[in-house]
Amino acid sequence: MSSELSNFFQSLSIQEEELEAWVTNLQPVFPMQEKPSCRRCDYKPKYRNTVSPHNPNGNAGRLYYICIKCKTDQDCEVSKTDHQKGWISWDDDRGVHPSNQNCDCGIVCRQDRAGENSSCPGRGFWTCATGSCGYSSYRKDGRTEEEAKDAKAAPDGGFEPWLF
């Protein structure tokens, strides 16, 4: 076999490894090309919102989507607190990194931090980067509580997010 042909096949195997790594750690693109749908009721928001410049959580100016149907529905039991009601997703790549574990959508998840109005202000957690699935974890390793129970692992508490 000629060295030129050998080099070609060698480059193919490198590309194959890179492709496998890329497929394993798919990253979402921000800003989102399409408005996300609410994972609770499938509503597609008409507008993208911007966090107030006076936000105390360090999120001033960040873009995000909420579901107005779930936000105003008094009977919505999915979110028990007002600050979570109707939340869909941030529309930026803050906290999204190729080394993050994958969520239930198969894309890398987002590392985030609970706001000051939450029951655990400042607590780190993992969530779906685009809000498409219900993935959420307060574990350092990103496993859900069900996955941790299945693995019979010792519980690990919350963590301080590295990105803040």
What are these regions (language model features)?
Residues 2-164:
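Intrinsically disordered, low-complexity linker/tail regions enriched in polar/charged residues
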